[in-house]
Amino acid sequence: MRLDKLAIKVATIVAGFTLTQLSACVGNTTGDRDNYSVNTLVDTGEITENSDRFIGKSVLIRNDVLQIIGNRGLILDKDRLIDGEPILVINMSETSIEISHDKTPEILIDGKVERFSKNSIEQKYDLNLESEIYGQYEGKPVIIATSLIMSPDPEDITANPEIYYNRPLAIKGEVDDVEDYGIFEIDEEKAFGGEDLLVVQFGSQAALNEEQTVIVYGVLRKFVMKELLQDYDLDWDSSIQTQIEAEHQQKPVLVTNKIQFL
């Protein structure tokens, strides 16, 4: 995460956002889909440098927001290690974003790449794109976002969990310390320092291996055993509860029923 970036805060329009709604919002990881690759994150610089390759394709991208333009537009940063330019995103999802001046994370966007023409985009999506900034992106690739979700690094969450409690999140990282009963940890790839994020699966559980790269979709909670057992119907006997509670009580925990393998 860039510490000098303008912050973003993602606020869901629909109140009482559940994990079931979250899974529907971000889409499925299996099945036919007109996209570049279901299980691949695409670099924004790769899209701007090779736009013809991506026009008409669905993509999954993750990066910092540089600027918000009105109610629908935003500029997503380019990747630091790859050539290319920032990319325009038109947000057609049911999630709004606003900028503050705090230090906050990337966002994960799912959408389709089109060639930007202000007039045609306004007509096609019934929009009124008033800002002059849009003129800078005429003829360039634009992502029409169908879903948008906060995607902080694991270490950002464990360092400042209060910012993220009870928010839907999509966390990218490597699987670590896989335990029984649907518990594992996730850490930032190639990161040094910082505390790993605890994850608890409920419902059907994905089989995981150490060092797999994944995106985990879920809601951040404080680890309070009684609440987790009640809210997610976790099948843990008393001895397991005692062991887990001793290790993780009051820590932030991401509760998930959706894991995407990259």
Where do the PLM segments sit?
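Bacterial N-terminal signal peptides that target proteins for export
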Residues: 2-12
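Bacterial Sec-type N-terminal signal peptides, specifically the leucine/valine-rich hydrophobic h-region
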Residues: 19-22
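OB-fold and OB-like single-stranded nucleic-acid-recognition modules
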Residues: 25-262
